[in-house]
């Protein structure tokens, strides 16, 4: 009985230590999520506007650019998978990998070979363990991505896209990105989006007056100047979405773990008290029994 009581007290101490860790992780995630949301909300308008600008530019100038014209026979598709560097964030990474596998299956069904690019140690470890060939990886900034990180990634993607699969074995015909879209603290969803070639929506002619644009120095030069910025901001916005989603998932997961630790400590404490009560009762019974035996001996 004494051994059982010691075991229960040891388990209570162990759970208490784990609770301190999960509570600390919860507080850290909570403190960082506000800054992540501010950065995300600041970047979203720019991402929307530059996409609208390029779409308008392509529509008005009728450009013939690789970013706009899909390859007649696409062979390879580059896929950028955005994951986290650390765990303890619930099903965040599992959902990203599941959505990535769905995209890979879809690309293969279309006769395209996926070329993998990853952000985050979790994706790097996941695909390395499964013997996937990883073309390029970037780690160490999943929680707090910077524009410079996105620019470096986008530069690599632009280079392989402009090469094309017909010109080089290192080139790709399409660029896709898998990331987690942040909607609220309680809602995030994994998305797979095509970044290149761009999808340009050509609207029907309207009877209403429309804005006329003048492009200087010319539409092609302007488009090529904006192209790196477009892909950079698309990657940066996706990384900010994923960072906010990662922190929200970690905050929820750690809060749930802390609450479960509280419940387990209460249950173990109750069981330990019962064991202690039984031990005291047994000791009292032994004392009373001994006293009665001495009284009868007299």
UniProtKB/Swiss-Prot annotation:
Belongs to the ATPase gamma chain family. It is a peripheral membrane protein. Keywords: ATP synthesis, Cell membrane, CF(1), Hydrogen ion transport, Ion transport, Membrane, Transport. It comes from Mycobacterium leprae (strain TN). Pfam families: ATP-synt. F-type ATPases have 2 components, CF(1) - the catalytic core - and CF(0) - the membrane proton channel. CF(1) has five subunits: alpha(3), beta(3), gamma(1), delta(1), epsilon(1). CF(0) has three main subunits: a, b and c. It comes from the Bacteria. This is ATP synthase gamma chain. The keyword Kinase does not apply. One of its GO terms (molecular function) is ATP binding. It is found in: Cell membrane. Produces ATP from ADP in the presence of a proton gradient across the membrane. The gamma chain is believed to be important in regulating ATPase activity and the flow of protons through the CF(0) complex. GO terms for cellular component: plasma membrane; proton-transporting ATP synthase complex.
């Amino acid at each position: 009985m004494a051994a059982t009581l010691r075991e229960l007290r040891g388990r209570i101490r162990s759970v208490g230590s784990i609770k301190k860790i999960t509570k600390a992780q919860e507080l850290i995630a909570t403190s960082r999520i506000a800054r992540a949301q501010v950065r995300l909300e600041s970047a979203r308008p720019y991402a929307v506007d530059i996409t609208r600008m390029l779409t308008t530019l392509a529509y008005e100038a009728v450009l013939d650019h690789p970013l706009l014209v899909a390859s007649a026979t696409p062979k390879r598709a580059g896929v950028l998978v955005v994951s986290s560097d650390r765990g303890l964030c619930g099903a965040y990474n599992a959902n990203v990998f599941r959505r990535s596998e769905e995209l890979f299956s879809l690309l293969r069904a279309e006769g395209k070979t996926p070329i993998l690019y990853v952000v985050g140690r979790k994706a790097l470890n996941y695909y390395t363990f499964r013997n996937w060939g990883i073309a390029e990886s970037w780690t160490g900034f999943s929680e707090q991505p910077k524009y410079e990180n996105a620019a470096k990634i986008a530069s690599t993607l632009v280079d392989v896209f402009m090469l094309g699969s017909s010109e080089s074995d290192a080139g790709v015909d399409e660029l896709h990105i898998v990331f987690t879209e942040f909607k609220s603290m309680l809602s995030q969803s994994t998305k797979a989006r095509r970044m290149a070639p761009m999808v340009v929506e050509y609207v029907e002619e309207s009877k209403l007056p429309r804005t006329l644009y003048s492009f200087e120095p010319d539409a092609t030069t302007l488009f090529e100047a904006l192209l790196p910025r477009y892909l950079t901001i698309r990657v940066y916005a996706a990384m900010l979405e994923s960072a906010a989603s990662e922190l929200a998932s970690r905050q929820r997961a750690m809060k749930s773990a802390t609450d479960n630790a509280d419940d387990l400590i209460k249950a173990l404490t109750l069981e330990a008290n019962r064991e202690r009560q039984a031990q005291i009762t047994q000791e009292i019974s032994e004392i009373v029994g001994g006293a009665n035996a001495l009284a009868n001996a007299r």
